[in-house]
């Protein structure tokens, strides 16, 4: 009889301790879940910082690329003089392309220098509230002018190349390609500026 009573007491003690064990285990799982959630928040913040840093560096890289492409196009057109009909200044289309390439080069170089100065800690010459709006509008205007110059130069170049292919037409085609790449860089820069401007308006 004593043994039965002892067994019953042991079983009662075990039943009484069981919830404590489960409670401790549940607390452990909760702490682990909270820790995992905190890690996710940190990763999200770090990813956002990286995205912001990339968006901040994009204008510098894109304007530098546009300046380089526009400069090459400018040099190719300006040096494309081979005598007789193979003189770029005999064609209004190429004169227009030369002028717009020079404008795109000057604008893109100025913007690249401005963004480089700002990223080094210097003051932006354009006030912060209107800087993104200026970038967005100016990039679109210069990109449109480049596309206009390309639309004027491509047809006459195609007509020339159907008749003859020589150094003059090759240099002109190369200049058009470089001007198109400058257009792409400025179009991408305008897209980034538009995205940053939209975020500024809704913040």
Swiss-Prot record:
Q: Which GO terms describe its cellular component?
A: plasma membrane
Chief subcellular location equals: membrane
Residue intervals annotated with topology Extracellular: 79-92, 157-171
Q: How does it sit in the membrane?
A: Multi-pass membrane protein
> Quick check: keyword Amino-acid biosynthesis in the entry?
no
Any one Pfam family here would be CASP_dom
**Where is carbohydrate linked to this protein?**
167
Location(s), subcellular: Cell membrane
Pull the Cytoplasmic topological domain ranges from the record. 1-57, 114-135, 193-203
Q: Which InterPro entries match?
A: CASP_dom (IPR006702)
Which ranges does the record mark as transmembrane? 58-78, 93-113, 136-156, 172-192
- Which of UniProt's keywords are assigned here? Cell membrane, Glycoprotein, Membrane, Transmembrane, Transmembrane helix
Query: Which PANTHER family does the UniProt record give?
Result: CASP-LIKE PROTEIN 4A4, CASP-LIKE PROTEIN 4B2
> Would you identify the family this protein belongs to, as annotated?
Belongs to the Casparian strip membrane proteins (CASP) family.
Could you give the subunit structure recorded for this chain? Answer: Homodimer and heterodimers.
Instruction: From the Swiss-Prot or TrEMBL record, give the protein name.
Output: CASP-like protein 4B2
């Amino acid at each position: 009889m004593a043994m039965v009573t002892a067994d019953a007491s042991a079983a009662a003690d075990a039943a009484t301790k069981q919830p404590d064990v489960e409670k401790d285990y549940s607390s452990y799982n909760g702490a682990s879940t909270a820790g995992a959630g905190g890690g996710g928040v940190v990763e999200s913040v770090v990813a956002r910082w990286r995205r912001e840093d990339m968006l901040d560096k994009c204008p510098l890289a894109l304007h530098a690329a546009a300046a380089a492409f526009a400069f090459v196009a400018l040099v190719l057109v300006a040096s494309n003089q081979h005598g007789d009909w193979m003189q770029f200044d005999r064609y209004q289309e190429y004169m227009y392309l030369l002028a717009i390439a020079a404008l795109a080069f000057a604008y893109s170089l100025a913007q690249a220098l401005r963004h480089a100065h700002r990223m080094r800690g210097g003051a932006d010459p354009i006030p912060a509230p209107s800087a993104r709006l200026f970038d967005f509008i100016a990039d679109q205007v210069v990109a449109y002018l480049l596309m206009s110059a390309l639309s004027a130069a491509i047809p006459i170049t195609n007509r020339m190349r159907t008749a003859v292919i020589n150094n003059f037409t090759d240099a002109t085609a190369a200049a058009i390609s470089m001007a198109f790449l400058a257009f792409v860089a400025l179009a991408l820069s305008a897209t980034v500026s538009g995205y940053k401007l939209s975020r500024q308006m809704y913040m």
